[in-house]
């Protein structure tokens, strides 16, 4: 009997959580959008730094001989 009550309570909680997510997805996904944007900034920074790193590598090989 207690197991049935616990199972019903867990099912009700999951149903409420799913309805809350589908009802208002904007605030919940805002955190993930910020993380995604931060990853894009890091990727863009690496792409922009690529030629500079290549020049430094060439300069060090020229200096080394």
Swiss-Prot record:
Pfam families registered for this protein in UniProt: Cecropin (PF00272)
Expression triggers: Induced by A.niger alpha-1,3-glucan.
Location in the cell: Secreted
Entry keyword set: Antimicrobial, Immunity, Innate immunity, Secreted, Signal
One GO biological process term: antibacterial humoral response
InterPro entries to which the protein is assigned, alphabetical: Cecropin
Family of the protein in this entry: Belongs to the cecropin family.
Function of the molecule: Has antibacterial activity.
Protein name as catalogued: Cecropin
Organism listed in the record: Galleria mellonella (Greater wax moth)
